[in-house]
Amino acid sequence: GCIKTGSGCTLSKGCCTKNCGWNFKCNPPNQ
């Protein structure tokens, strides 16, 4: 699942999945 960019990531990093606490894993938009 991906959350909208801006929650700890920039647009260039695609989408992010919430990992743990304040940490976010950023993945390319195609994942």
Swiss-Prot record:
Q: Where in the cell is it found?
A: Secreted
Q: What does this protein do?
A: Toxin with similar potency against both insect and mammalian sodium channels (Nav). It inhibits inactivation of most Nav tested (B.germanica (BgNav1); EC(50)=97.5 nM, human Nav1.1/SCN1A; EC(50)=125.8 nM, rat Nav1.2/SCN2A; EC(50)=137.8 nM, rat Nav1.3/SCN3A; EC(50)=138.9 nM, rat Nav1.4/SCN4A; EC(50)=150.2 nM, human Nav1.5/SCN5A; EC(50)=108.4 nM, mouse Nav1.6/SCN8A; EC(50)=92.8 nM, human Nav1.9/SCN9A; EC(50)=102.2 nM). Inactivation is completely prevented by a concentration of 1 uM, resulting in sustained, non-inactivating current.
Q: Does the keyword Secreted apply?
A: yes
Which positions bear 4-hydroxyproline? Answer: P28, P29
What's in the keyword line of the UniProt record? Answer: Disulfide bond, Hydroxylation, Ion channel impairing toxin, Knottin, Neurotoxin, Secreted, Toxin, Voltage-gated sodium channel impairing toxin
Query: What other facts are recorded?
Result: Negative results: does not show effect on rat Nav1.8/SCN10A.
One example of the protein's molecular function in GO is: sodium channel regulator activity
Please give the tissue specificity annotation from the record for this chain: Confined to the epidermis and to the mucus layer.
Of the GO CC terms on this record, one is: extracellular region
Q: Which family does it belong to?
A: Belongs to the nemertide family.
Instruction: Tell whether Oxidoreductase is among the UniProt keywords.
Output: no
Q: List the disulfide bonds.
A: C2-C16, C9-C20, C15-C26
Protein name according to UniProt: Nemertide alpha-3
According to the UniProt entry, where is the signal peptide? none
User: From which source organism is this entry?
Assistant: Lineus lacteus
User: Know anything about its domains from the record?
Assistant: The presence of a 'disulfide through disulfide knot' structurally defines this protein as a knottin.
